[in-house]
């Protein structure tokens, strides 16, 4: 999702667990790529002013630990920005239904059943649980947004974005 980020930093550090993703970004001169184990980010604590996580937490088995690891790498006052799909919200399910019937079969040559299986095994955390983890652990430190309707309800939106500021 890096190509859809609308930021103008001089340098980006991308930590990936996937060889495919590392290969995808290797020709961008602004990007410093590292491959990592998905648990321990190989940077010293208090290194970054901003960390952006786009569509990752729904795939991670221990999202609370992952967020804590990211927060440890932020400078005081730094911001962790997280973007998530609102899976299994109603709007997300309707979007998946549309994709399943009109895109998946033609583009990826897989059945709807295979598509559902892929999502079930890859999206191990629901948006409802992830929001609860964020709200509980970062009270008074976060600003959240729902898109496209901007109503604070996961069922009626496709994406949840949150910015957590490191206070201590």
What kind of region is each of these model predictions?
Residues 61-75, 79-167:
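S-adenosyl-L-methionine-dependent methyltransferase catalytic module, highlighting the catalytic core
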